[in-house]
Amino acid sequence: MNFGRIAAAAVVAWIVSLVVGFVVNDILLAGIVAANVSVLRPEADVMGNLPIGFVFLLVGFFAFAYAYAKGYEGGNGIVEGIRFGVLVSLIVIGFGLIWQYVMFPITATYAAAIVIDSILELALYGAIVGAIYKPVVVTRGKPATV
């Protein structure tokens, strides 16, 4: 396992996620988020909590890249990464995101947007991790002759 590549993949995907998160939440879904503002923290509170979110997001990306490396099957890294990202998104949706809709009074539109965004973003992050991660290649010399 190539831990240097795992770390690089995690950090690059994390940096991309910061940009994508801003574009998605503050631009593309701004209207949907505004329609659900009554169930969200005030913006000042969110800004104060961002460092916590960023740290745990980075930890999550290390786990994501490590899990990808453990399951890497030796094929096209980007394709394997997309497949891995979609699989992880389905786990996250089933165990976590859908429960936001069940537990909190968000609109069905917001819930659907979160689900679709999660699939697309995690597929993107999987592609990034798959493009960067390369396993350590072990070369074996010729067997000794007597």
Predicted regions and their residues:
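Juxtamembrane/disordered regions of integral membrane proteins
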Residues: 1-146
